[in-house]
Swiss-Prot record:
Biological process annotations from GO: rRNA processing
Protein's name according to its UniProt entry: Endoribonuclease YbeY
First and last residue of the signal peptide: none
Source organism: Shewanella woodyi (strain ATCC 51908 / MS32)
Enzyme class: hydrolase
MF-aspect GO terms: metalloendopeptidase activity; RNA endonuclease activity; zinc ion binding
Claim: DNA-binding is one of the keywords in the record: no
EC number: 3.1.-.-
Family to which this protein belongs: Belongs to the endoribonuclease YbeY family.
Location within or outside the cell: Cytoplasm
Cofactor binding, note field: Binds 1 zinc ion.
Length: 158
């Protein structure tokens, strides 16, 4: 398992807004964020907020027009061109949806958490999966990053 990284100064604000007890540690989140951002920047600030289904559903409804909770929402920070800030943005991750999906997809919970963090960070970096070409590129990068963490390809049937 390769975890070598370009030196990244990371300021990660982890906010826990759920009663769920099966959550990764601060160190887990930092490792996954560092892995997703490796070789892309030298300094980054972001917030990861772990929420319950109610908050996820409200945000998903407001910002995506979908009235249901979702696994991860990404909110990139867009600074004016003349301002240089290392602020990447915010990830909102719904603990109960991540747990449900891990069970449904027969994946280890920790592996699915890692995948959701990496997936969200790639969105913050500007990757998307709206069309097939973008989806293939994003999935390929995700798979490489997840496998470098010692987890299985998240898109393969388990």
């Amino acid at each position: 398992m390769s975890t070598s990284h370009t030196k990244l100064e990371l300021a990660l604000d982890l906010q826990i807004a759920t009663d769920n007890k099966q959550l990764p540690t601060q160190q887990d989140f930092e490792l996954w964020v560092r892995t997703a951002l490796r070789n892309t920047m030298t300094e980054a600030e972001l917030t990861v907020r772990v929420v319950d289904a109610e908050e996820s559903q409200a945000l998903n409804s407001t910002y995506r027009g979908k009235d249901k909770p979702t696994n991860v929402l990404s909110f990139p920070f867009e600074a004016p061109a003349e301002i240089e800030l290392p602020l990447l943005g915010d990830l909102i991750i719904c603990a109960s949806v991540v747990e449900h999906e891990a069970i449904q997809q027969n994946k280890p919970l920790q592996a699915h958490w890692a995948h959701m963090v990496v997936h969200g960070c790639l969105h913050l970096l500007g990757y998307d999966h709206i069309n097939d070409i973008e989806a293939e590129e994003m999935e390929s990068i995700e798979t490489q990053l997840i496998e470098s963490l010692g987890f299985n390809n998240p898109y393969k049937e388990q």
